[in-house]
């Protein structure tokens, strides 16, 4: 017994040394310590940095390396572990973790614990390896993906699964205890990944109260583990043989009270926990939480607060802390790296380059990777920042490691770059082609005709398809997202495309979710717009207050082919990308002057209007849903570009009929372009302001080749927050506002596409948002905090509805079902019965799921998460990689 105790004490001593040895000779875990502070005060950066070499791995790298005893340990996206000699950069050994093609997008960074190397994988296995030989010491089957990196303490290591199951393990991987957030805090004991199980346990749909995902990093403060789970900050003590819950801390109410998403979490040695959170629509800040007994005291870092009406974008990374200073990155040009100092209301900009990569604070510099693929070395004192390029401009999204005067930089191009003093190595020239798909989409619906290739499914904007959707639903894959989104998933070429409101364009495999490529363009500002996949190209309207560009990319590689300017604000509801006819891409927008906050109440969404310096009308970039009129300089515009070159083919300006243009819709049907726009419901206000009073809106049929108007009507038109839908020779028009100031009623209108004449007007409804979904059997529209409606195809009578009180959810239809927030599935053929709900991965309910190519895809609007599900027979045959 005495010998065992001596041995165990020796192990503890070794482990303790390994954890605190954060001098310049080692980098033992993510962000340098279990606090995730990023504070490496002992690490020196050479004055003359250059590339020492670049080590090719087997996939993109989304993890941070660990360094000790002259070896570098890295994990690539495919879960391959690499041990590299720091002096020669030769590979000493490598270890392929289990899971095959589905074991991708690995983000759990390795940790060195004495003679062991710890890491988790997307396949749901946790590994302990002998770090000297690569031999497997222990494999723990957690049966859930692991996003968090191991947090190594004095005598134990901690990690959590994405489903918020927490593990404490000994250095050799022996499990000391487990703790389950879903069971202990939410009180749910079923299959957390099953929508049917949640429905059995709940009388209604899941909401933000059921949110449970743990997708970001843990912190360890002494013996207290801090876990970002389900929008809460959980303080959990290691009580020896078990865990003891101290408190599940909550972010204070600000722009709502829902449990928000955590996009980054770190702590300092004083016990302060810094949480970068997001609740909705750019609203968030860095909250400071600290245990006070079994309660939590809160404050926030001044100058980090963002909102829909305030200037500045969210951050999507943890902050780094030294003393009273907080260092924070953002994906915003001009505000890339900022220092927030105690007592200062506004931050100091240290480097303008945008980033989603947590910074590392060395002795005299801050180090971070940019979305432009460069390493930035920024002096803490005066002086110019140094930028060091990588070979292929691929983003650097995982933090660097610093040891022995070298900087180890993981890149999404698949290379581990090593920078050091007097480095003179050339950049690599061999493209590792991580952008090539490795798991092609297969199955009965894999053909291109089954693609959901644009925001509303097709150029008719029917928002509907039929691909034999039926229960049961089963998870296929999950992946993390560092951004916010308001468009529906878009698919084509076996790839899923995402455009974040902050300017990232991302492509991943539909089958596995594996990241293929990521591009970021500066000056994109809250652009809630969707990509379009067409003919191997990707068209993305990227809007911003400073500039707006239509960008055409090669869909396979992300290479920019052309870009063209446009004007106006997409605001909340103009998610749609261009429509394409032949070789012409056509887009609709407005014009005008914009700022985060407008000059009049009808031009703002919230807050006090702000007068402009020159007295001119200014529209909020994200403006009110209630639209009696629009500013004088808002013109309704149409743009037509050559799809191959981006050259203008024709333009159209309808401002002689009214002012507006941002709240509009377009679709293609039977070789014709249909356009509808809103000028505001109040003719009397427009007359008093000297604006054209005659028309509240306009709908037109146009020749797409030339822009020639075939017919136009000012009798029926969209009333904002809705596009128009074309199918079977009919147009369907909805919206949020009343059509005129004499009535509060809203309707869906069905028009004859030949001449614009009215076929039917629906029963009065609360509103009709986003798009009127028109399938073979059903016509449906959602309402904002009201009843969603099912309409009779021939009369417009309301014949059914959905009463689950959704907000602005962008439902889609895959008959006979509609798909809503958190993958809710409602059967319209069974009286709008809810047949599946959840899992609750999103704290908001702005987006629905889509069915494309026989799979379900869902992007959380607020919580930084993308998932795919299978259904029917495929649910039995194509499980998630962790589902065994």
Language-model regions, residue ranges each:
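A short beta-strand motif characteristic of beta-propeller blades
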Residues: 51-55, 90-99, 135-140, 175-179, ...
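Sec/Tat signal peptide C-region and signal peptidase I cleavage site
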Residues: 19-21
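Bacterial N-terminal signal peptides
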Residues: 5-17
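Non-catalytic propeptide/linker segments at domain boundaries
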Residues: 427-442, 446-448
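Blade/loop signatures of beta-propeller domains
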Residues: 23-51, 190, 441-475
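Short loop/turn segments that connect beta-strands within beta-propeller blades
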Residues: 85-89, 130-134, 170-174, 237-241, ...
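Repeat-blade elements of multi-bladed beta-propeller folds
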Residues: 24-34, 58-82, 95-127, 139-167, ...
